[in-house]
Amino acid sequence: MKQRLKVKYLNTVIPELKEKFVYNNLNQIPSIKKITINRGLGQSHQNSKSFDYFLDELSVITGQRGIVTYSKKAIASFKLRKKSPVGVSVTLRGEKMYAFLDRLINLALPRVRDFRGLDKKSFDGCGNFSLGLNEQLMFPEIDYDKINSVCGMDISIVINSGNNEESLFLLRELGVPFSELKVS
């Protein structure tokens, strides 16, 4: 079963992209390649129970088991040893990627307090988009009573477009809410 966001991309977004931008080849049409969700452990890297909890929580949110990221060198001021766990990362592709993006757009972002849209300045110049979330409570899969600590995550959407304009158009047509800055 195809995800509804992928069906929308194939049926409506691709023709609109072809109409607005000129492409000589079908492979030049921008598409989302992967979504990477990264979550740092902060002070929790010393406690293995909270570390396992963060790993399970991220797998519930994304539908895929994460991998552990380790420190490359020791930093004494952070009480960090070499090769100690410092974060959890998940890379989503294919159907799970579209399912997560659909849940992010339609369920999680509207639940953010005082949400007025995502900032257009979060593009990196090559068409990739990054956003940071302050808490995990916005996802409906998370049970409020079972949370050890509130912490956020970084989400990077990798798009194979050469510039920010095409990526912004693609994400806007998929339904990602961007803020409209009014110049006064």
UniProtKB/Swiss-Prot annotation:
Entries under Pfam families matching the protein: Ribosomal_L5, Ribosomal_L5_C
Role noted for this protein: Binds 5S rRNA, forms part of the central protuberance of the 50S subunit.
Keywords, alphabetical: Chloroplast, Plastid, Ribonucleoprotein, Ribosomal protein, RNA-binding, rRNA-binding
Subunit structure: Part of the 50S ribosomal subunit; contacts the 5S rRNA.
GO molecular function, one term: structural constituent of ribosome
Main localization (coarse): plastid
GO CC annotations on file: chloroplast; ribonucleoprotein complex; ribosome
Highest classification ranks of the organism: Eukaryota, Sar, Rhizaria, Cercozoa, Chlorarachniophyceae
InterPro entries recorded: Ribosomal_uL5, Ribosomal_uL5_bac-type, Ribosomal_uL5_C, Ribosomal_uL5_CS, Ribosomal_uL5_dom_sf, Ribosomal_uL5_N
Protein name: Large ribosomal subunit protein uL5c
KW Transport (keyword) present: no
Family according to the record: Belongs to the universal ribosomal protein uL5 family.
Gene: rpl5
Location relative to the cell: Plastid, Chloroplast
GO biological-process terms attached to the record: translation
